[in-house]
Amino acid sequence: MAEYSQTGILTALLLFTVVTVKDIYVGRNSVTQQENTGPDINTQRQNKHTFYTGPVLKFQYCISUGYSKVFQEYSRSISQLYPDIRIEGDNYPPKPINKYLGNFLSYFKLLAIALIVTGQNPFQMFGMNTPRIWAWGQENKIFSCLMAFFISNMLETHFLSTGAFEITLNDIPIWSKLQSGYVPNIQELFQILDNHLKMNQADKMNFPSP
């Protein structure tokens, strides 16, 4: 029974460590890929802009808030009603300080779980008294790893979440959740698009070509 419990503890702790390392690695790898492919993407977009002169509808939204699904649903509906509109979507970047705090928590989570798994006491290394909570965590490794994992993830989400759902048409803002406080329903968005497209057509008619 003791052997089974020890094996289960080691397996659970190893799982937490692997998931945490994967979380950090995947996040870093995606950022690196975006940076490496950035010039190519920008070149492709510039080439598309040289051939495409129609309206461009751009969404910037909070991915961690679950707005990716909303963007996909709205994109399908808008494409059916306005097939000439090109739709783009991207994550709304958090503030730099929040981004750095989120990255710090990712590494802190990994370090905390690694110390719990190996049984190391960082307080003794610095000549400090061991807090009771750390001694309790060593006696309850699975539960303490759970707490470190989920609390760190909760704080990461808090710092990286912007709550944004911003919409621009030809680089002109037509909706901002950060200002209005809510995401428009699809009918509201249709009405907004219709009004702006009519205004753009009227402006083109008022300026005759030379």
Curated annotation (Swiss-Prot):
Widely expressed in the embryo. Keywords: Redox-active center, Selenocysteine, Signal. InterPro entries: Selenoprotein_Rdx-typ, Selenoprotein_T, Thioredoxin-like_sf. GO terms for cellular component: endoplasmic reticulum membrane. There is a cross-link at residues 62-65 (Cysteinyl-selenocysteine (Cys-Sec)). Residues 1-21 form the signal peptide. May contain a selenide-sulfide bond between Cys-62 and Sec-65. This bond is speculated to serve as redox-active pair. One of its GO terms (molecular function) is thioredoxin-disulfide reductase (NADPH) activity. It holds the Pfam family Rdx. GO terms for biological process: cell redox homeostasis. Belongs to the SelWTH family. Selenoprotein T subfamily. PANTHER family: SELENOPROTEIN T, SELENOPROTEIN T2. NCBIfam families: CXXU_selWTH. This is Selenoprotein T2.
